């Protein structure tokens, strides 16, 4: 199992093979992103306990680079985004965003788009507050599982900020125009039950059950065909112009033959196709 600390930048010198407690003892209060890879699942943890895991400017900048590295890691078949402790992410740490509002928004949009473009399945595991930029990140994931007691809000109207068009479209695609307007116009928080009813989250778990369910579900994800998942992700996200590309990928892979053989043999399939690296 590998754990990394990501501050202003991603550096291989930060790769650690220590439990989280050891990482915390090295840099006890500095906001950063942690990540670990275990059983083919990359888990990215937002850590800023002094500000309820609000994202600093350095963390926004670091996230796209981290995601790029994980996307190119053949050991990674799925990604979980979560917050340390009892909070997912309380948005942006405004005290670290000293440039213009446009510059701050650009950092968040770049991170959001990098997460949305991650070529493997992504899941947000949400406890506590998921507000502002936290909701922006969660919405950019493919799936969202929340613990009872989680609260969700989109709060730019409280700051006089124009919410990005890309984030607005993504929110509307999840909850529909009426609920998106409710959230954007008011900045009010909604509970996990309403988030589930409106489509903002996919599952709500009782207290103490979120980790178990996420582990259980990601185990399913990593056992499935990456070819099927990658094509379905593109099509579901609106890229319907690549039918022939994915047909060629299917013809060149052995996933379909393996899936059929495994079904007939009553065994678990061993799919070989993997997402190509950017290099």
Name each region found by the language model.
Residues 30, 261-279:
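Terminal low-complexity tails and localization/encapsulation signals of metabolic enzymes
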Residues 111-117, 125, 131-184, 198, ...:
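CoA-thioester-processing core
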Residues 188-194:
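Acidic, divalent-metal-coordinating active-site segment for phosphoryl/phosphodiester hydrolysis
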Residues 14, 21-84:
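Conserved CoA-thioester-binding segment of acyl-CoA-metabolizing enzymes
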Residues 75, 83-114, 160:
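Glycine- (often His-adjacent) and acidic-residue-rich active-site loop
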Residues 145-150, 178, 201-244, 254, ...:
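C-terminal long alpha-helix characteristic of the crotonase
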